[in-house]
């Protein structure tokens, strides 16, 4: 697998994350209903440019989405022409397959704007990011088992930030909420990587723990969007669950390592 393809894949994944963060910022600033609620046109000169700062935010989100979309198409081309790992090919294909529905949902968030549509827009974007993150994990070598414990400890150190920035206890500015999503997506990505690497080592229970942690972290992000009237304290409960999951991962790996070294860890 070429370094160029790997770098482009990682870059497009990072671009997708930035696009999601810009979209969340747009939603929290109420800019999604600017551009006179028109899509794909805006409210400025000839409908191609924004008329004010609020519509500029929405316009920038659309422009970035277009750029990221074209980059992903190029990544898909390279995935099928320049590298041999079929898992990576199909993961990137799945991400690009979801793009048309995501574009349609993005348009509907402007013209319709219901809680269900905006939630579907977030879910689809999350699935695209998940497919790309999985593809990234599959392009790197599987680390040794002891690195999984290090990963769990590092992820556990991030959970307090996930807990503190969610806005469930104090009213926080939009910039802090975007920080919450940044931390949360990175945390979820690390947990997904842990699940895939645990699977590669045959560690079934560790894989399930990592996967559960990633799922709860994502659910916290969905609840934090405040679209369905769910109690914001659920995000705090979720953060504590993730922390307990990571403690269980570290404890299990430590116990197995002490009991019989690497061989015992593999025999899950």
Regions found by a protein language model. Give the residues of each.
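Polytopic transmembrane helical bundles with strong interfacial aromatic enrichment
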Residues: 1-268
């Amino acid at each position: 697998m070429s370094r160029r393809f790997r770098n482009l894949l990682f870059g497009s994944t990072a671009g997708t994350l930035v696009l999601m963060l810009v979209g969340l910022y747009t939603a929290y600033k109420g800019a999604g209903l600017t551009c006179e609620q028109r899509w794909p046109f805006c409210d400025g000169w000839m409908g191609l440019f924004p008329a004010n700062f609020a519509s500029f935010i929405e316009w920038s989100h659309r422009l970035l989405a277009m750029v990221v979309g074209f980059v992903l198409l190029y990544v898909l081309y390279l995935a099928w022409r320049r590298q041999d790992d079929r898992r990576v090919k199909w993961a990137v294909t799945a991400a690009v397959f979801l793009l048309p529905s995501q574009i349609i949902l993005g348009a509907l968030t402007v013209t319709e704007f219901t809680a269900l549509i905006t939630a579907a827009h977030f879910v689809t974007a999350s699935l695209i990011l998940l497919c790309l993150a999985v593809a990234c994990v599959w392009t790197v070598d599987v680390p040794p088992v002891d690195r999984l414990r290090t990963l769990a400890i590092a992820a556990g150190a991030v959970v307090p930030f996930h807990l503190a920035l969610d806005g469930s206890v104090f009213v926080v500015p939009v910039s802090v909420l975007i920080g919450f999503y940044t931390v949360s997506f990175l945390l979820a990505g690390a947990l997904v990587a842990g699940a895939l690497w645990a699977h590669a080592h045959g560690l079934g229970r560790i894989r399930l723990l990592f996967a559960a942690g990633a799922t709860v972290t994502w659910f916290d992000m969905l609840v934090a969007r405040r679209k369905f009237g769910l109690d914001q304290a659920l995000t705090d409960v979720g953060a504590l669950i993730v922390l307990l999951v990571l403690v269980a991962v570290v404890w299990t790996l430590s116990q197995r390592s002490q009991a019989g070294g690497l061989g015992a860890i593999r025999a899950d």
